[in-house]
Amino acid sequence: MFNVVKKTFAYGDHQVTIETGEVARQAGGAVLVSMEETVVLVTVVAAKNAKPGQDFFPLTVDYQEKTYAAGRIPGGFFKREGRPSEKETLTCRLIDRPIRPLFPDGFYNEVQVIATVMSLNPEIDSDIPALIGASAALAISGVPFNGPIGAARVGYIDGQYVLCPTLSQLKGSQLDLVVAGTEAAVLMVESEADQLSEEVMLGAVVFGHTEMQKAINAINELVEEAGKPEWEWEAAPKDEALVASLSALVSAKLEEAYNITVKQTRSQAVKAIRAEAVAALCTGAEGAPDENTVGNLFHEIEASIVRGRILSGAPRIDGRDTRTVRPITMRSGVLPRTHGSALFTRGETQALAVATLGTNRDEQIIDALAGEYRDRFMLHYNMPPYATGECGRVGTPKRREIGHGRLAKRALLAVLPKPEDFSYSMRLVSEITESNGSSSMASVCGGCLALLDAGVPLKAHVAGIAMGLIKDGNRFAVLTDILGDEDHLGDMDFKVAGSTTGITALQMDIKIQGITKEIMQVALAQAKEARIHILNLMQESAAGPREEMSAYAPRLYTFKINPEKIRDVIGKGGAVIRALTEETGTTIDIQDDGTITIAATSGEAAAAARSRIDAITAEVEIGKIYEGTVLKILDFGAIVSVLPGKDGLLHISQIAQERVNKVEDYVKEGQIVRVKVLETDDRGRVKLSMKAAAADEGTVAQPVAAPEAAVQQQQ
């Protein structure tokens, strides 16, 4: 019934098994990938024909984590998996980026890749098995695909590269790098690092690419035994006569349009040329081309002009050479009521970054499949439609915004202070107010400045730069600080962020079928030159963290109490701590070990809260005189409160030197009396004495004539 084919190979310290033929047999391609009890099912389904009028490649990648994979039941009312988590969204992008450029030009059939995590070993991240599975499922499906690809995670521990480290190993690693590529070349890199050199980063990419050949070989063997026949698909032949007509109509005008350096003006000119060409050629007559065909050919001519000029050594679209960074301006403290803010502008790309400080109560609690954890640093990237002069939907963040925010966060993580040195939680929001290339790297620069403006003691300044590539045969040009058009019409988007010491984040996406080590070396060297230039400007603008925090930022005051006193501070049903926070205007956090953190915008409020907590947690001292309140009258004495939550017995024999017949003759409920602590027994009961306190202070206890009368009088 089942024709099961399995391939197993060693991958670092792990065994990886790729299996097909038993599960999801009606899909175009389906594989189960297992790595040390982490199991991912990946399926591929492709439409046999493109939809009429389709002019783009509709590839969809879905990655979903099932809670049963970790032996858990989902929370919430419905007890089902809900909207994708950030991890799921980022993994979708991780799979999409290396496989998309391997589909042939002109292939517009709908393709859907679904990766489902079915079993999870908390030590083994499911993203690498999902990537390998996507490659294998596509390879055996017969869909036109120039793969397979391999994928590997690389760590850097004690000066050695580690293939596919576990999550425990990653905690001690200076590098977390994911690389994907074909047998011949690298297609995608995603990483965060602890200020590592360009040489170490390049070595990690090469190491990962070398090791992933094991996965590629296993997939090739799987295809030989279980692969479906390749589709008989060919790209539609080009209409050379139409190409010639369109080129004659638009080439000279496009050459002129790409001499315009202002983005909006240039875009309008290009749109007008395109509209003119469509009107001239798409007449509706028999045999006339449709708008999609003309539009695709127009894009090719556009790309040919821009790319040809750069490769010939002519100036770029905005007049720069290949190594020059656009003009940069930056300003900190731009928003008066925020904790920290900065406006970073590079050419026609602008980011307004805002930093907010909070307590550990404000940390994000992430309910991950591998287990719940807290995140003290959040970075959110927003790019509204006005940033590109367009109208559009405003709402929940799209995959692109989540991905860009994660990249900027990776860039800054390495320079954040340790929690013990800076106990605040931090939220950074990057509002992209203008966009013409590399807005994520503008978020890194602006975010660094905003954190410094908020008083965060960063270990170093961090800047980011986006590099591009134009490649034609053996000729290539690496571009520094690419524009949006250069990204759109080029072959690579290579983002590098770091400090003067080294790289903290690196992301590379290739639109052609891979690049070589030589090109990566040139790109990294050029990126370092640009990064140092930007860092110098940033250090001139903000040499270090602001000494005095914003008046609106919370001040944190931390101290410890006896853990046994925690319940006294919290009170029954939280009544005590709730009253404390409301009456002092502070936020109070208590840890299980007795560490208390008071967050307040003024020192006076924090001091008031500290004083009240000290009073609640104070221990009664034997021999000390206290001013207490009479809580209750008894036949044999009175109950007196000497500290919050600390009551003692004032026995009738300890009220006055003379004999006391009735307690009410000397004390009344609610009155303030001075008492001395005589002793406490092993059960914590406190014995008090008015007459001992009076003797020590030279006073005498007198009977009261009325409730308002003084209990004690000076001799």
Curated annotation (Swiss-Prot):
Its EC number is 2.7.7.8. The keyword Chaperone does not apply. Residues 554-613 form the KH domain. Its cofactor is Mg(2+). This is Polyribonucleotide nucleotidyltransferase. The gene is pnp. Its main location: cytoplasm. It is found in: Cytoplasm. Mg(2+) binds at D487, D493. Residues 623-691 form the S1 motif domain. Involved in mRNA degradation. Catalyzes the phosphorolysis of single-stranded polyribonucleotides processively in the 3'- to 5'-direction. Belongs to the polyribonucleotide nucleotidyltransferase family. One of its GO terms (molecular function) is magnesium ion binding. It comes from Dechloromonas aromatica (strain RCB). Keywords: Cytoplasm, Magnesium, Metal-binding, Nucleotidyltransferase, RNA-binding, Transferase. It holds the Pfam family S1. One of its GO terms (cellular component) is cytosol. It catalyses: RNA(n+1) + phosphate = RNA(n) + a ribonucleoside 5'-diphosphate.
